[in-house]
């Protein structure tokens, strides 16, 4: 197997296959669940709006892939600084049956100099999650500066985040290798690689992209660090490219490119 094919297979099993569009329907989510199951393995998870969790759970169970995890989003996509609303949404997501919650960090508050609200929001959302994985989206493409990206990453980790995630996919600039490196370095430098994972989201579209991101993680955190507990790709159009690279002809219904 070529290096690119090996990376493609690795990436497929780390995907949070995503549809987070305003026109999402039960039918689109059912189709997404079908796409999560491929001839070469399943994606790690799907990522959907909370209201679709029950239909997704049913579909995944019926197609024999109940192990595909269901991630959902809260405080999404704007990352407001209302802790009460973020926590209420997170509690509701847990009640719906989410396996994982991707919450948006109040990044604009941090840009305005407020470090406390982000810490408190993440801390309370993690308390609401209990054992459920909490991924925190810091919106790197809006923070832009290394100092802010590293500070947001540190705050999230100190507040109990299980993962730090680059982006919502809803702003002009999403995951980039430059931002990914900054966040991976924080995980390394804080000594939390055992407990904290990383998720680039938006803009990872090809097997070559995925291979480069994985090589970077191997370089910074070691060859054995990347697994589904420590690394995810938030993507939709990536799956088709990975399957093409692997020469698997599964028909994939492509949600709007993410």
From Swiss-Prot:
For this UniProt entry, the molecular function terms from Gene Ontology, in alphabetical order, are: deoxyribose-phosphate aldolase activity
Question: What name does UniProt use for this protein?
Answer: Deoxyribose-phosphate aldolase
Q: Which GO terms describe its cellular component?
A: cytoplasm
Taxonomy of origin reads:
Bacteria, Pseudomonadati, Pseudomonadota, Gammaproteobacteria, Vibrionales
Pfam families from the xrefs?
DeoC
Some GO term, biological process aspect, for this entry: which one?
A: deoxyribonucleotide catabolic process
**Catalytic residues as annotated in Swiss-Prot or TrEMBL:** 102 (proton donor/acceptor), 165 (schiff-base intermediate with acetaldehyde), 199 (proton donor/acceptor)
Identify the metabolic or biological route this protein is part of: Carbohydrate degradation; 2-deoxy-D-ribose 1-phosphate degradation; D-glyceraldehyde 3-phosphate and acetaldehyde from 2-deoxy-alpha-D-ribose 1-phosphate: step 2/2
Keywords, A to Z, come to: Cytoplasm, Lyase, Schiff base
Q: Respond yes or no to whether keyword Cytoplasm is given for this record.
A: yes
Gene3D superfamilies documented for this protein: Aldolase class I
Does Nucleus count among this protein's keywords?
Answer: no
As recorded in UniProt, its EC number(s) are: 4.1.2.4
Localization per record? Cytoplasm
Stated family: Belongs to the DeoC/FbaB aldolase family. DeoC type 2 subfamily.
Its source organism is Vibrio campbellii (strain ATCC BAA-1116)
Role played: Catalyzes a reversible aldol reaction between acetaldehyde and D-glyceraldehyde 3-phosphate to generate 2-deoxy-D-ribose 5-phosphate.
Instruction: Give me the reactions it catalyses.
Output: 2-deoxy-D-ribose 5-phosphate = D-glyceraldehyde 3-phosphate + acetaldehyde
């Amino acid at each position: 197997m070529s290096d690119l094919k090996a990376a493609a297979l690795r990436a497929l099993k780390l995907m949070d296959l995503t549809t987070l569009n305003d026109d999402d329907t039960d039918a689109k989510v059912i189709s997404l669940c079908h796409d999560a199951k491929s001839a070469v393995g399943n994606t790690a998870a799907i990522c959907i709006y909370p209201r679709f969790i029950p239909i997704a759970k049913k579909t995944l169970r019926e197609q024999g892939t109940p192990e595909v995890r269901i991630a959902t989003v809260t405080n999404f996509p704007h990352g407001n600084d209302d802790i009460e609303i973020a926590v209420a949404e997170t509690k509701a997501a847990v009640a719906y049956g989410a396996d994982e919650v991707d919450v948006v960090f109040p990044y604009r508050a941090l840009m305005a100099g407020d470090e406390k609200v982000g810490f408190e929001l993440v801390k309370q959302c993690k308390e609401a999650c209990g054992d459920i994985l909490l991924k925190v989206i810091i919106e790197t493409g809006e923070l832009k500066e290394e100092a802010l990206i590293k500070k947001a990453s540190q705050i999230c980790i100190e507040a109990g985040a299980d993962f730090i995630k680059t982006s919502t996919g809803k702003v002009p600039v999403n995951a980039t290798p430059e931002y990914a490196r900054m966040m991976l370095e924080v995980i390394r430098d804080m000594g939390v690689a055992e407990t904290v994972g990383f998720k680039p989201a938006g803009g990872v579209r090809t097997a070559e992209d995925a291979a480069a991101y994985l090589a970077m993680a191997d370089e910074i955190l070691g060859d054995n660090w990347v697994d589904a507990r420590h690394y995810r790709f938030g993507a939709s159009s990536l799956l088709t490219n990975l399957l093409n690279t692997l020469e698997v002809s599964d028909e994939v219904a492509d949600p709007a490119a993410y």
